[in-house]
Structure formats: structure tokens, C-alpha cells
From Swiss-Prot:
Active site feature: 259
PANTHER family hit by this protein: METHYLTHIORIBOSE-1-PHOSPHATE ISOMERASE
Organism: Populus trichocarpa (Western balsam poplar)
Protein role: Catalyzes the interconversion of methylthioribose-1-phosphate (MTR-1-P) into methylthioribulose-1-phosphate (MTRu-1-P).
Site (Transition state stabilizer) residue list: 179
The protein, known as: Methylthioribose-1-phosphate isomerase
Reaction equations catalysed: 5-(methylsulfanyl)-alpha-D-ribose 1-phosphate = 5-(methylsulfanyl)-D-ribulose 1-phosphate
EC number(s) given by UniProt: 5.3.1.23
Pathway this chain belongs to: Amino-acid biosynthesis; L-methionine biosynthesis via salvage pathway; L-methionine from S-methyl-5-thio-alpha-D-ribose 1-phosphate: step 1/6
Organism domain of life: Eukaryota
Length: 375
């Protein structure tokens, strides 16, 4: 992966984690933010896998889009592939399986791979040459990129409206969020941070609060970076300060993202989310999850079935999420899960691009019913 310095902005002056033009993909190296803005050239699926695994790009939607586009770039520039359409489809399916192995918890990646396999399988059945299959794949991956931005804006709109309707004073809101769920975690705009952006755009957001999100510091490095860039009034807090902030009545609502949502609404998200949900319930503060339907996994009946990725001990032993000098005692053992699961019983509502999923007296959500009605 080659580096390419950039100012990190597209023509509309928004932060971009993914810069794609057919045959070319550049990913913002988020490990170096906010002090350095560097893009890495992604030439093929191997580069994409490494970028995802090493946290160059992170955030469930961005991971899925980056994986799909890394393979699109590879096949755009592929020479001397002389196989049949069926062999082309098999080649793509194998690459997609490889990309899915980069990070197992976020369902968006496996969901995207499944959909893309279906596209190439259908294309292979009708194609007379391998290039037609590759072209079908490239176009499908590009549609996913555009669709992600549109769904994020819908999430922001639905979430802002719903939260305002649930508040006694909808004109003065303060919202707490965790990890990074904005333009840097998606193809653009963001999920939970998109809701905050929408509230700010409507002039009703007094303040956004973001946690540091240890140990990789996505909140302090990335969310704070986005909030400052967007000129949204914001305050950074330590993860351990959230309960005190809520006790002082400074939080109207908590909005977080999701890496995987089970059929009952149990939600896997960045480690520390479960703690925030418990604090919010204790202080009678609504706790919302904002996620596209691609983050839902109906094959899992509950969060107990979600595989939780464990990260390197170095992220905790060393400063800057493992990138800096050692700060912990040598020889200490480390438990470093990247995610935790928040039970549906602690979640007030799940904000999607099709509307807000609510409960009717039950601890669980009826995700299947909502999806069926939403079409």
C-alpha cells in the first residue's frame, strides 16, 4: 500500500475516508489522525484485507465498502484472465471470502460479500465472457458506495425527528456518543454521528459529547476531529466520566452505532457501549442505536451468538492504542475485546434508514416484523 498525502477533503468540504474512482481506491489512514492526513493506495483485495485488519479503515459500513471496492479495483486492472464466466465468478467469490476474514464481528462485510456473490453468480449464468462478470461486480460495488451515503442521511433524518419528539424541550438537546460513527466510519455522513449532524443542522443541538473510546481512542482521535471540522459544539470526555455527566443532567440522549444487531435487537458495538447503556438506564436517559439494515443479522437469535473479536494486547500496553511507547507493566496479562453486546432491554430504539424500531412493552425488538413491513 503506497502513501499519498492529502488534505482529506472532497469537493463538498466533507471528510472522506474512502476516495474512489473506477480503477483507483485511496483509504484515509485513520491510525494517524488527527495529526497527519495520509491516504493509502489500495491496489487489490490483499491491500484491502490488510487495511481493514490493521485499522487503516474502521467502522462497519466503511469496512464493507472498502472491501468491496478493493476487489473492484483489482478486477478493473486485471490482465490476462482467460477463464470462463463461471471461473470468474469463482475467482471473485474466493476473494470475497478472504476479505470477510479480515474482521469477523461487523456483519456489514459478510452481508456485502453475500450480495455480491449473488450478483456475480447471476452474471456468470448469462455472460458469454469473464469481462461481463467482472463488469457486473464493479457496478454492484459502486452502487453499494452510493447507497451507503443515502441510507446514512436517512438515518440522520429519522433519528433527529424521533429524538426531538421524545423530549420535553426539543430545542435544547445534548447528545452523548461513543466511538466514531461519522464520515470516517462510513462512505459519508455517518450513522450515530449523522443523527448528531442532523440535529445540529436543525439548530436544536446545544452540545455533543464524545467519549475517548479507549484503548484505540476512536472518539478522541476521530469523532472529535469530525465535530471540530463540522463546527459542531462538542466536548470530549473520558470514558469513565460518562456516568457523572449523566448524573449532572447534561445528557438528553445517548446515540451509538452498531457492528451487528441480532434478531431480538441485542447489539454488538465498540467496547464500552454496554457500560453506557447501563448508565443511561440508571439515569433515565434514552439510549438509541443508529445503524443501517445491513448491520442486522437475522440469523442470530440473540447477542449471545455474536462472535467478539479480540485485539492485540499492545493496544492497551502501549500509548496511542498500541502505536506509542509502552505505559503498562511488562508481564501483565491483557483482555482486550474490541466489542461488547448491549442487551435489547437497555435500548430505547434502533434508528434505521427505514425508520425507528421501537418496542411495545417487551424487552426485545421484533426486527423481522419491522423489516417485513419496511419492504
Amino acid at each position: 500500500m503506497a502513501t499519498n498525502p492529502s488534505n482529506g477533503l472532497e469537493g463538498d468540504n466533507t471528510l472522506q475516508s474512502i476516495c474512489y474512482h473506477r480503477g483507483s481506491l485511496k483509504l484515509l489512514d485513520q491510525r494517524k489522525l488527527p495529526l497527519e492526513t495520509t491516504y493509502l493506495d489500495i491496489k487489490d483485495a490483499s491491500d484491502g484485507w490488510l487495511a481493514i485488519r490493521e485499522m487503516v479503515v474502521r467502522g462497519a459500513p466503511a469496512i464493507a465498502i472498502s472491501a468491496a471496492l478493493s476487489l473492484a479495483v483489482e478486477v478493473s486492472n486485471l490482465e490476462n484472465f482467460n477463464g470462463t464466466p463461471v471461473e470468474a465468478a469463482s475467482f471473485l467469490a474466493g476473494k470475497l471470502d478472504y476479505l470477510v476474514s479480515s474482521r469477523p464481528t461487523a456483519v456489514n462485510l459478510s452481508d456485502a460479500a453475500t450480495k455480491l456473490k449473488e450478483v456475480v453468480s447471476k452474471a456468470a449464468a448469462a455472460a458469454s465472457n469473464c469481462q461481463s462478470v467482472f463488469q457486473a461486480y464493479i457496478e454492484a460495488a459502486e452502487i453499494m458506495l452510493a447507497d451507503d451515503v443515502a441510507s446514512n442521511k436517512a438515518i440522520g433524518s429519522y433519528g433527529a425527528r424521533f429524538i426531538q419528539n421524545q423530549q420535553k424541550d426539543p430545542t435544547k438537546l445534548s447528545v452523548l456518543t461513543h466511538c466514531n460513527t461519522g464520515s470516517l466510519a462510513t462512505a459519508g455522513y455517518g450513522t450515530a454521528l449523522g443523527v448528531i449532524r442532523a440535529l445540529h443542522g436543525e439548530g436544536v443541538l446545544q452540545r455533543a459529547y464524545c467519549t475517548e473510546t479507549r484503548p484505540f481512542n476512536q472518539g478522541s482521535r476521530l469523532t472529535a476531529f469530525e465535530l471540530v471540522h463540522e463546527k459542531i459544539p462538542a466536548t470530549l470526555i473520558a470514558d469513565s466520566a460518562a456516568a457523572a455527566l449523566m448524573k449532572d443532567s447534561k445528557v438528553s440522549a445517548v446515540v451509538v452505532g452498531a457492528d451487528r444487531v441480532a434478531a431480538n435487537g441485542d447489539t454488538a458495538n465498540k467496547i464500552g457501549t454496554y457500560s453506557l447503556a447501563l448508565c443511561a438506564m440508571h439515569h433515565n436517559i434514552p439510549f438509541y442505536v443508529a445503524a443501517p439494515l445491513t448491520s442486522f443479522d437475522s440469523s442470530l437469535s440473540s447477542g449471545k451468538e455474536i462472535i467478539i473479536e479480540e485485539r492485540s494486547p499492545k493496544e492497551m500496553l502501549n500509548a496511542r492504542g498500541g502505536l506509542g511507547e509502552q505505559v503498562a507493566a511488562s508481564g501483565i496479562s491483557v483482555w482486550n475485546p474490541a466489542f461488547d453486546v448491549t442487551p435489547a432491554s437497555l435500548i430505547s430504539g434502533i434508528i434505521t434508514e427505514k425508520g425507528v424500531i421501537t418496542k411495545t412493552g417487551m424487552d426485545d425488538f421484533d426486527i423481522k416484523d419491522f423489516i417485513n413491513k419496511a419492504g
